[in-house]
Amino acid sequence: MSILITRPSPAGEQLTQRLIDAGKHAFHAPLIEIAAGKELSILENKLNKLSTGDYLFLLSKNAVWYANWQLNQLQQSWPDTLFYYGIGQSTAEEFQQLTAHSIRYPEFGETSEDLLALSSLQQIENKRVLLLRGNGGRELLATTLRQRGAIVDECECYQRLFIDYVSEEFALKWKNAQVEYLCGHQCEMLQQLLSSRWI
């Protein structure tokens, strides 16, 4: 019996190693890789459009990492005049560790619905909002903030790129490893897996 870990690097390798250390048979075959987003180079311009009291949303740890990396490359710092929001606790903690800025996030849950339920986001009419995100994903947050009267802009800080394995080789590896369990964390990865010929 073996467990197939499909999470991207480095989290996938870390999870695989923890399972092996716990005495489980596991192997890592990520279905996506994470790369810099198509709009990362214009992040600074988008930040400069925000004014004191505007809102900046960080929608994943990858968005935090790539945005922070870009600002460091430009020798720029995060503005201290904005309200920062994280999609959840892990994203917020990543941001706080890298920047030392305070950031708000839902006490429970890590979804757009949880974030939108915060009382401080109910009255945001005419406020500028910048969403730092990856490619694809849900539009609920942007749509709802616009419905509440916010002026919403987005910046694709990172992108998820599907890895195209050679079907026959991967099918043989999966069979030889006697995979019985699959560990993933996003619906789009499961769809990619199910659409492949090697399962």
UniProtKB/Swiss-Prot annotation:
Matching Gene3D superfamilies: 3.40.50.10090
Designated gene of the protein: hemD
Protein name, UniProt field: Uroporphyrinogen-III synthase
Keyword Lyase annotated: yes
GO biological process: protoporphyrinogen IX biosynthetic process; uroporphyrinogen III biosynthetic process
Domain of life: Bacteria
Enzyme Commission number: 4.2.1.75
Function: Catalyzes cyclization of the linear tetrapyrrole, hydroxymethylbilane, to the macrocyclic uroporphyrinogen III.
Organism (species): Proteus mirabilis
